[in-house]
Amino acid sequence: MLMPKRVKHRKQMKGRMTGAACRRIEISYGEFALQATECGWVDSRQIEAARIAMTRYIKRGGKIWIRMFPDKPLTAKPAETRMGKGKGSPDSWVCVVKPGMVLYEMEGVTEEIAREAFRLAAHKLPISTKFITRGTQNEG
C-alpha cells in the first residue's frame, strides 16, 4: 500500500474540502483517465484495490499511472477508550481528492477496454468519477 516514507509531522488536522482542484486536472501521461467529480478522502487500501481491479481486467496490455498519493495521516483511538487523553495515534493514510482531479491514467489499450477497466476501478472508490480522454479533458 502507498504511504510516505517519512513525514515532518506525525499528525494533521482534519481540514476542509472546499472548491475544485487546480492541480492534477489534465491528462499528463496516458490517453484515457479517471477524473473525480466530487470531493472526498480516498484511502491507500482503496487506491490499491482500484489498481488491482484495473490491472486484472487489462491483463498484460497497456500501462497504468496512479496520479494520487495518500499523504494525509488519519488518527484513531483504541476501541473502548474514554474520551480525552489526547489525539489518537496515526492509523491510516488518505489522499484528499477534489472535483476535477485526475486519479488514474491509462494507455496502450482500446477505449472500450479502458472504459470498462475504469468502471471496475470506480466501484472500489468512495467518490463519483467520470471517464475522460486526452481530446475531451476540458469539457464540462
From Swiss-Prot:
Gene Ontology biological process terms, A to Z: translation
Molecular function terms from GO: rRNA binding; structural constituent of ribosome; tRNA binding
Pfam entry (one): Ribosomal_L16
Highest taxon in the source lineage: Bacteria
Record keywords, A-Z: Ribonucleoprotein, Ribosomal protein, RNA-binding, rRNA-binding, tRNA-binding
Membrane-spanning intervals of the chain: none
HAMAP family (UniProt xref): Ribosomal_uL16 (MF_01342)
Function in brief: Binds 23S rRNA and is also seen to make contacts with the A and possibly P site tRNAs.
Protein name: Large ribosomal subunit protein uL16
UniProt source species: Trichlorobacter lovleyi (strain ATCC BAA-1151 / DSM 17278 / SZ)
